[in-house]
């Protein structure tokens, strides 16, 4: 899996501007046990560099995309991170190795409950899982140094921009459901203005909930 991630990073360096990912991110990708986050029938494919179904019409993301999004977020040890779309909990686990605290929201109750139990069992004590609509963020713990959205939105949710700290970064796929979307890097400048940059074409499940 790690060799495949490295190869894809090289292949996409023209689009992403990244000939290599942060060594800390790659170390964590090699450490987090992906097999703990996939259903039993997907275990033979757990370490393939591909998305896998986890039930309820959702997927665990391709490891390369998890690594890229984590790298783009530039998470530091003291940071507080918000994730929208817990899914299996895999991305949250990766972020938990790099951040002080991870707050993650899942709208599909069975997935959220399973992820919470799984993360607790694996000892990720700095991750909190909430059931709810991630479009509105988690204002109680805002502002966040980084926000990762793991489902495609038709636009960048204004509540998430508000909850992003000045100097913070949001990584989010934007575009129509079930079509090719653009992975976007959203940066909130020190003066409160926002700049965006397209990183890479991607295909994510759609963000659900109220708009």
Swiss-Prot record:
<comment type="function">
    <text>Catalyzes the methyl esterification of L-isoaspartyl residues in peptides and proteins that result from spontaneous decomposition of normal L-aspartyl and L-asparaginyl residues. It plays a role in the repair and/or degradation of damaged proteins.</text>
</comment>
<keyword id="KW-0963">Cytoplasm</keyword>
<keyword id="KW-0808">Transferase</keyword>
<comment type="similarity">
    <text>Belongs to the methyltransferase superfamily. L-isoaspartyl/D-aspartyl protein methyltransferase family.</text>
</comment>
<dbReference type="InterPro" id="IPR029063">
    <property type="entry name" value="SAM-dependent_MTases_sf"/>
</dbReference>
<dbReference type="GO" id="GO:0005737">
    <property type="term" value="C:cytoplasm"/>
</dbReference>
<dbReference type="GO" id="GO:0032259">
    <property type="term" value="P:methylation"/>
</dbReference>
<dbReference type="GO" id="GO:0036211">
    <property type="term" value="P:protein modification process"/>
</dbReference>
<dbReference type="GO" id="GO:0030091">
    <property type="term" value="P:protein repair"/>
</dbReference>
<dbReference type="Pfam" id="PF01135">
    <property type="entry name" value="PCMT"/>
</dbReference>
<feature type="active site">
    <location>
        <position position="61"/>
    </location>
</feature>
<dbReference type="GO" id="GO:0004719">
    <property type="term" value="F:protein-L-isoaspartate (D-aspartate) O-methyltransferase activity"/>
</dbReference>
<keyword id="KW-0489">Methyltransferase</keyword>
<protein>
    <recommendedName>
        <fullName>Protein-L-isoaspartate O-methyltransferase 2</fullName>
        <ecNumber>2.1.1.77</ecNumber>
    </recommendedName>
</protein>
<dbReference type="InterPro" id="IPR000682">
    <property type="entry name" value="PCMT"/>
</dbReference>
<keyword id="KW-0949">S-adenosyl-L-methionine</keyword>
């Amino acid at each position: 899996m790690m060799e495949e991630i490295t190869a894809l990073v090289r292949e996409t360096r023209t689009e992403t501007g990244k000939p290599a990912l942060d060594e800390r991110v790659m170390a964590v990708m090699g450490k987090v046990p992906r097999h703990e986050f996939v259903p039993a029938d997907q275990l033979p494919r757990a370490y393939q560099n591909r998305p896998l179904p986890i039930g309820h019409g959702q997927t665990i993301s391709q490891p390369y995309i998890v690594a890229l999004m984590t790298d783009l977020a530039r998470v530091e040890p003291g940071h507080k991170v918000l994730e929208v779309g817990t899914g299996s909990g895999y991305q949250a686990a990766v972020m938990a190795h790099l951040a002080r605290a991870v707050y993650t929201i899942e709208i599909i109750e069975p997935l959220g409950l399973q992820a919470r139990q799984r993360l607790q069992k694996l000892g990720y004590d700095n991750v909190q899982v909430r059931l709810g609509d991630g479009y509105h963020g988690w204002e109680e713990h805002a502002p966040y140094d980084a926000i990762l959205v793991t489902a495609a939105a038709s636009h960048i949710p204004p509540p998430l921009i508000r909850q992003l700290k000045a100097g913070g970064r949001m990584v989010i796929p934007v575009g129509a459901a079930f079509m090719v979307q653009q992975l976007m890097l959203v940066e909130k400048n020190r003066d409160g203005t926002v700049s965006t940059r397209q990183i890479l074409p991607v295909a994510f499940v759609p963000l659900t909930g109220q708009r």
